[in-house]
Curated annotation (Swiss-Prot):
Classification of source organism: Bacteria, Pseudomonadati, Pseudomonadota, Alphaproteobacteria, Hyphomicrobiales
Name by which UniProt lists this protein: Small ribosomal subunit protein uS17
Domain of life of the organism encoding this protein: Bacteria
Gene3D superfamilies assigned: Nucleic acid-binding proteins (2.40.50.140)
Family note: Belongs to the universal ribosomal protein uS17 family.
InterPro entries: NA-bd_OB-fold, Ribosomal_uS17, Ribosomal_uS17_bact/chlr
Known function: One of the primary rRNA binding proteins, it binds specifically to the 5'-end of 16S ribosomal RNA.
Encoding gene per record: rpsQ
NCBIfam families: PRK05610.1 (NF004123), uS17_bact (TIGR03635)
Length: 79
C-alpha cells in the first residue's frame, strides 16, 4: 500500500525534532453545496529542526516514531 503524502503549513516548531503541520481539506457541503474548509493538525518528524512556522511542507506517512508522531517531513514547498 502506498504511503499517503499531504501538504500543509507549519504552525508549531517548539518541540525538539518535531513540527506541527496544519493540513486543510475542502469539500462541498452535502445539503448547501457550499465549499467548507476543515483543518487537522499532525505532528511530523523534522530531524534537523530546519522548518520554521509559516513554511509550506509535504509530509509522508511512516511507522510510529512516538506516541503522537506518525508522519515525516519530506520537503518544503516555495514560500
Amino acid at each position: 500500500m502506498p504511503k499517503r503524502i499531504l501538504q500543509g503549513v507549519v504552525v508549531g516548531d517548539k518541540n525538539e525534532k518535531t513540527v506541527v503541520v496544519r493540513v486543510e481539506r475542502r469539500f462541498a457541503h452535502p445539503l448547501l453545496q457550499k465549499t467548507v474548509r476543515r483543518s487537522k493538525k499532525y505532528k511530523a518528524h523534522d530531524e534537523n529542526n530546519q522548518y520554521k512556522i509559516g513554511d509550506t511542507v509535504s509530509i509522508e506517512e511512516c511507522a510510529p516514531i512516538s506516541k503522537d508522531k506518525r508522519w515525516t517531513v519530506i520537503s518544503a514547498q516555495g514560500q
